[in-house]
């Protein structure tokens, strides 16, 4: 469980912001989104494979040198 201690004279909004950052850092929000609905293992593998291919194409596109203009 993520907890934060309120500092003396700290506004509530600042404490909420610190709490949200702590939760985001722990990965709790991402885990909740994953567990929101069941995803079949085959679908998860397919999604991860597609993301890997997309990353590969993006990396290759950035490494390609532009053609020489004469």
UniProtKB/Swiss-Prot annotation:
One of its GO terms (molecular function) is structural constituent of ribosome. GO terms for cellular component: ribonucleoprotein complex; ribosome. It holds the Pfam family Ribosomal_S21. One of its GO terms (biological process) is translation. Keywords: Ribonucleoprotein, Ribosomal protein. The keyword Ribosomal protein applies. The keyword Ubl conjugation does not apply. Belongs to the bacterial ribosomal protein bS21 family. This is Small ribosomal subunit protein bS21A. It comes from Paraburkholderia xenovorans (strain LB400). The gene is rpsU1.
